[in-house]
From Swiss-Prot:
Lineage of the species this protein comes from: Bacteria, Pseudomonadati, Pseudomonadota, Alphaproteobacteria, Hyphomicrobiales
Annotated segments matching region 2-C-methyl-D-erythritol 4-phosphate cytidylyltransferase: 1-243
Family: In the N-terminal section; belongs to the IspD/TarI cytidylyltransferase family. IspD subfamily.
This protein's name: Bifunctional enzyme IspD/IspF
Catalysed reaction equations from the record: 2-C-methyl-D-erythritol 4-phosphate + CTP + H(+) = 4-CDP-2-C-methyl-D-erythritol + diphosphate; 4-CDP-2-C-methyl-D-erythritol 2-phosphate = 2-C-methyl-D-erythritol 2,4-cyclic diphosphate + CMP
Amino-acid positions noted as binding a divalent metal cation in the UniProt annotation, renumbered to this chain: 250, 252, 284
Source organism per UniProt: Rhizobium meliloti (strain 1021) (Ensifer meliloti)
């Protein structure tokens, strides 16, 4: 969000519920149940902890949950300064307690979020923050209803089909200018009203215009036991590393000359490799292998042999370029393996320097770089000393994406 560094929004995390519909558990209410490897509330707090727009954070808990919350807080991935207050008999009164605590900090805006919605992200927070900065007094992230809706009567019989036009499913964080929503909550409490199911409803009752903003499909509330199971499965899938393997193959002809360059090492020899660049067949194969891990084409796409600027160029330039593309796309090179197929020259005496060159270019440790060599048993063009071939394999781990490549809801 542009100008985010000047924007500060108070946060109220509502975590005082007992979660009866999720069933009983030795771990306590659902906000303290483990999904992935940490409590639900720890996942939720971590997202606010890393959002630049987050100001003072107040967590509203049940008086009986002090120890549960303290334990959950220790499981957070990052640090977050926060204030803990006790909730009331209803969600509405718990939110009021949180708003009173936030008001004491002097912030202008507040986000009210359910602890049991751990799958929101910074994109949603940025969208909400931008709407507040643009003048909205109250805003509600929501998703258009896609399912057909039915209203029932006695005995579970369908009474009618409800038109879903202009119907939206409300989410949190629900966001407000602090003073109007605090005033509305105080008035609602004084009036004895306790039937509001969310904070936007109180804003509507108080005459505060509520703006809808686009919610997030994954930002669902963990209500039932099956929701917790689905959340755990989702986090388990997200934790699986995105490991990709790419292969590359290259061959260059041997012609009369004084030596060959392999993995950046010049080896004196009675012949040389023919090519537009320095014809380092090993680095060319590894360049293709790296590019293959992210679908970035091949070496010819990036350095066409028809381009005179690459005439005689050292092939480390090509490998550095491929490694940079991998990094820009979120990848970390974890292994590089090259097999050279040649009758001559002997690779063994130069193997260590070759490995050191690979490690330096790729920024990885020496034990992640492998160079092997074999003859072709005098078979084929390699066996006739007409050329040298190289086969390379690269292993790259890419950062997990917050959203899958395909919609897995169905």
């Amino acid at each position: 969000m542009q100008g985010e560094e000047q924007f500060s929004c108070g946060v109220v995390i509502v975590a005082a519920g007992r979660g009866e519909r999720a069933g009983q558990s030795a771990e306590g209410p659902k906000q303290y149940r483990t999904i992935g490897d940490r409590p639900v509330i720890a996942h939720t707090l971590d997202i606010f902890a890393t959002w630049p727009g987050a100001g003072p954070v107040v967590v509203v808990i049940h008086p009986d949950d002090e120890e549960l919350f303290a334990a959950a807080r220790k499981r957070m991935a990052g640090a977050l300064e926060l204030t803990v207050v006790h909730g009331g008999a209803t969600r509405q009164l718990s939110v009021l307690a949180g708003l009173e605590a936030v008001a004491a900090t002097g912030v202008e805006y507040v986000m009210i979020h359910d602890a049991v919605r751990p799958f929101f992200d910074h994109t949603l927070l940025d969208r909400c923050g931008a709407a507040l900065r643009d003048g909205a007094q109250a805003l509600l992230p929501a998703i258009a209803v896609a399912d057909t809706l039915k209203r029932t009567k006695a005995a579970g019989l369908v009474a009618e089909t409800v038109p879903r036009t202009d119907l939206y499913a409300a989410q949190t964080p629900q966001c407000f200018r602090l003073e109007p929503i605090l005033s509305a909550h105080r008035r609602a409490a004084a009036s004895g009203r306790s039937d509001f199911t969310d904070d936007a409803s109180i804003a509507e009752w108080a005459g505060i215009p509520v703006l809808l903003v686009e919610g997030a499909v994954d930002n669902f509330k963990l209500t039932l036991r099956r929701d917790l199971s689905m959340a755990d499965e989702k986090l388990t899938r997200m934790a699986i590393p995105d490991v990709r393997t790419g292969n590359g193959y290259d061959v260059h002809q041997l012609v009369d000359g004084d030596g060959v360059t392999l993995c950046g090492v010049f080896i004196p020899h009675g012949r040389k490799l023919s090519g537009h660049s320095d014809a380092d067949v090993a680095l060319h194969a590894l360049t293709d292998a790296l590019l293959a891990t992210c679908g970035a084409g091949d070496i010819g796409d990036h350095f066409p042999p028809s381009d005179p600027q690459w005439k005689g160029a050292p092939s480390r330039i090509f490998l550095e370029h491929a490694a940079r593309i991998v990094r820009e796309r979120g990848g970390t090179v974890t292994n590089a393996d090259i097999s050279l197929i040649a009758e001559a020259p002997k690779v063994g005496p130069h193997r260590q320097q070759m490995r050191e060159n690979l490690a330096a270019i790729l920024g990885i440790s020496l034990d992640r770089c492998s160079i092997k060599a074999t003859t072709n048993e005098k078979l084929g063009f390699v066996g006739r000393n007409e050329g040298i071939a190289a086969i390379a394999t690269a292993t790259v781990v890419y950062a997990s994406r917050s959203k899958p490549d395909v919609d897995d809801r169905y």
